[in-house]
Each structure stands twice: as structure tokens, then as C-alpha cells.
Amino acid sequence: MPRDNMASLIQRIARQACLTFRGSSTGSEGPAPGFPENLSLLKSLLTQVRAEDLNIAPRKALPQPLPRNLPPVTYMHIYETEGFSLGVFLLKSGTCIPLHDHPGMHGMLKVLYGTVRISCMDKLDTGAGHRRPPPEQQFEPPLQPLEREAVRPGVLRSRAEYTEASGPCVLTPHRDNLHQIDAVDGPAAFLDILAPPYDPEDGRDCHYYRVVEPIRPKEASGSACDLPREVWLLETPQADDFWCEGEPYPGPKVLP
């Protein structure tokens, strides 16, 4: 059963998100006044939320492989304004949300049940042009000529596992803006805030990427596991085996 104060908590989360991200959809330069303090308050509220508070029961693992007609990920819409969206993503066992970006957006992710592994990356700003791999650099698997022209430098900043006991994972327009989310050892779900929401007509479309690994000389110092480390990113279409469908949200309603 939800705690007695949870209806007010999810309402307070939405209200605090409104304060934190006010003006984020208007194209105004920089965050609103008091943004760091408001963001800290929002993180504190998100840290408290649990699956039972939203009337969401942890899902059981389904037999593998998943039937092809079942979406690997579903989404429960809770609330949305021009400034932010609030909802829950549910990942089936063994699935992931592929590496993708959030152009000009902030994001906050709080695990409700299960464990997710989040890999956070950024594209490296190279000014007016872009840096290409040197001609002698080889990749595994090899890149086609057009792919070689299209790859961009990036940085893999972190890779960590989050559970319901973890605080929220936060991304900004300039830090950890690309991420991949994998369900680890079973199904998982997380509460998600995006500010402002995706809007292709306003330049906030979702782009997918894959990491292409250079072949490293055996004598090269350091390990591929050392983070942060430079990577190469190739924009790709949405994977055929990934899609997301909606399902009803069973928890307390959020009012304007």
C-alpha cells in the first residue's frame, strides 16, 4: 500500500519540477534563477519515491527469449507540461534502452525496482568542424567508408548500477547527455523526468548511437575499462528490436 503522504509526494515532485524547470521550453538563455537550489530539492524528493508509492508491483521475469510481439520497454505517462514530462519506464529482463541523446534537455532518473546499469557519455565539442579518426586507425568490426566519415569523438564518462536504494541519476544538456540503460538480472523500472520533453519540431528529437571501438595496440597503456575514456560514436537508426509502448499508470494522479 502507498504511504499516506505519497499522493502529496508525487504531487510535490511535479510541483517542484515546475519550479525547477520553469522557462526551459521557451528557449531562454541559461537556467531559471535559483536553479541549483530547486534541482537539489527535486533530487531530495525523488530519492524518497518507491514502486509501491505509485501502486506499481515489481514485474516477474518472463521466459527468454521474449515473444516478438511483446515490447521490450513500456511507458506509463503521469504528467506533462511544456516544461517537463513525468513518467515511468518499465524494462523487461535482459532488455535495454539503447544509447540515445537528449538535445538541450535535463533528465532525472530514479529506480523504482530492480537494477539498471547506466552508461553515461557525451559528444566532444570540436568547434565548427569535427575530428575524424586518423587514416591508420582501425576499428572492430571494421567501418565502411561512409561510416568512417560519420563517426564523431565522444567520451564515456561513467558506467554504474542503480537500485531503488540509489539516489537519482541526473543528466544535463552538457554533461552525461547520452546514456544507455540496461536491465540487470531481471526486470526493472524507473521514474523519469525530462525537461523540456522531446519535441522534434523544436529541435529536440531523439537520436540513437552505437559505440565503435578502435583496435588498441597491445602495448597501449591503460585499460578499456578505465573511465573516463574517449570513444567514437556513430549515429544509427532506432534498432529493429527496440520499441516502447504505453500502458496505464495506476498510481496517484497529478493535478495542474
UniProtKB/Swiss-Prot annotation:
Keywords: Dioxygenase, Iron, Metal-binding, Oxidoreductase. InterPro entries: PCO/ADO, RmlC-like_jellyroll, RmlC_Cupin_sf. The gene is Ado. GO terms for molecular function: cysteamine dioxygenase activity; iron ion binding. It comes from Mus musculus. CDD domains: cupin_ADO. It is an enzyme of class 1 (oxidoreductase). Fe cation binds at H100, H102, H179. Plays a vital role in regulating thiol metabolism and preserving oxygen homeostasis by oxidizing the sulfur of cysteamine and N-terminal cysteine-containing proteins to their corresponding sulfinic acids using O2 as a cosubstrate. Catalyzes the oxidation of cysteamine (2-aminoethanethiol) to hypotaurine. Catalyzes the oxidation of the regulator of G-protein signaling 5 (RGS5). Also oxidizes proteins RGS4 and interleukin-32 (IL32). Ubiquitous, with highest expression in brain, heart and skeletal muscle (at protein level). Its cofactor is Fe cation. It holds the Pfam family PCO_ADO. Monomer. This is 2-aminoethanethiol dioxygenase. It comes from the Eukaryota.
